[in-house]
Amino acid sequence: MLAFCRSSLKSKKYIIILLALAAIAGLGTHAAWSSNGLPRIDNKTLARLAQQHPVVVLFRHAERCDRSTNQCLSDKTGITVKGTQDARELGNAFSADIPDFDLYSSNTVRTIQSATWFSAGKKLTVDKRLLQCGNEIYSAIKDLQSKAPDKNIVIFTHNHCLTYIAKDKRDATFKPDYLDGLVMHVEKGKVYLDGEFVNH
């Protein structure tokens, strides 16, 4: 009888531990996924991914001047002063964990300015292909990756590009705000979407 009681108590303890672990796992899973169904990838997670394989991070440009009442940096087709501050803050946080990357942008004033303020002096390459947002963008990404297979890549592009990629790769509805991003990688000639970048 005593042995049975001990066994029963052990079983109850085991069940309680399992339930607690399941609850923790459930919370972790909830926190690790965005409401749109994309995995959330913060700076530290991105750094761990970059140790496994080079990453490609695509950002939407910073706040547009022509759609804001905030002060413009310069050209009306560019970004606002607030946009430059936001881009610099994001760049500082990003570079703390991923210091080594090649930098690209589409050929618009707003993406060029965003990339410039993000990078704080890093060489920027402008590529007009990054304005095209169908399957062409995958070809562009693979081409850029092939030039430096071991380097991480940061690309400044547009909301419709990010929306297209999320829908095409994971059937997710992604409506990016300014400076929101997606994390991808190239493997054996294919481009994969890992998740949504979250600057935490």
From Swiss-Prot:
Compartment(s) where it occurs, according to its Swiss-Prot or TrEMBL record: Periplasm
One Pfam family it belongs to: His_Phos_1
One Gene Ontology cellular component: periplasmic space
Induction per the UniProt record: Induced by BasR. Expression is significantly induced in the presence of zinc.
Gene3D superfamilies found in the cross-reference section: Phosphoglycerate mutase-like
InterPro entries, alphabetized: His_Pase_superF_clade-1, His_PPase_superfam, LipoPS_heptP_Pase
Pathway: Bacterial outer membrane biogenesis; lipopolysaccharide metabolism
Keyword terms: Hydrolase, Periplasm, Signal
UniProt-recorded Gene Ontology molecular function terms: phosphatase activity
Cleaved signal peptide residues: 1-25
Enzyme class: hydrolase
Alphabetical GO biological process terms: lipopolysaccharide metabolic process
EC number: 3.1.3.-
Function: Catalyzes the dephosphorylation of heptose(II) of the outer membrane lipopolysaccharide core.
Family recorded in the similarity comment: Belongs to the phosphoglycerate mutase family. Ais subfamily.
Name of the protein described by the UniProt record: Lipopolysaccharide core heptose(II)-phosphate phosphatase
Gene name of the record: ais
